[in-house]
Amino acid sequence: MKKNIIIAMMAILALLLCACGAKQEGFGQDDLGLEVNGETYYLRTDSAPLIAALGDGYEYSEMVSCVYDGQDKTFAYPGLTVNTVPVDGKDIIEMFTLTDSTYATLRGCKVGDSREAVIAAYGEEYFDDGYINYTLTNDPADIQAERIQFEMNGDTVSAIYIYSPSY
């Protein structure tokens, strides 16, 4: 009887541990952001709070927007470039480009990580067109789908693009 109780308790404990180790969900809207100083900034939101958090140490450029009325802007920081588009009087985040290991994706991937680390973090549902692509639709033909692209140099991440195409 005592042995059966111990076995039953071990089975319950095993079930509880399995329930706590919830599987990472597939790629989704919540992955389309960047954490800076404990705050998360997402694509398609006002860039002003992010630029304020990053500070003044950037190289700035702008050009007439092909899609919107106003100026597309680029704020290039060491290891991170933020591209914006003008929407309703605000500079909206269109893309983050991570170029060194200073910044990570919201799942912790950085420049310098291995291909295996990326797949472990984001899963097998990607397509490879020269980049490892995780998109909201997982459709290579859907060029308008928001995405994360991992540029590879061999099996090592050399740049990461988190973006929302405007076209």
Regions found by a protein language model. Give the residues of each.
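Positively charged n-region of N-terminal signal peptides that target proteins for export
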Residues: 1-4
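C-terminal motif of bacterial Sec signal peptides marking the signal peptidase cleavage site
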Residues: 16-19
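Bacterial signal peptide processing site
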Residues: 21-23
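N-terminal export/targeting and maturation segments
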Residues: 25-59
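Acidic/histidine-rich, surface-exposed loop or edge segments in extracytoplasmic proteins
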Residues: 28-36, 94-103
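Second-shell loop/turn segments in exported
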Residues: 34-41, 102-109, 147
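A cross-family detector of function-defining hotspots
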Residues: 47-89, 110, 115-167
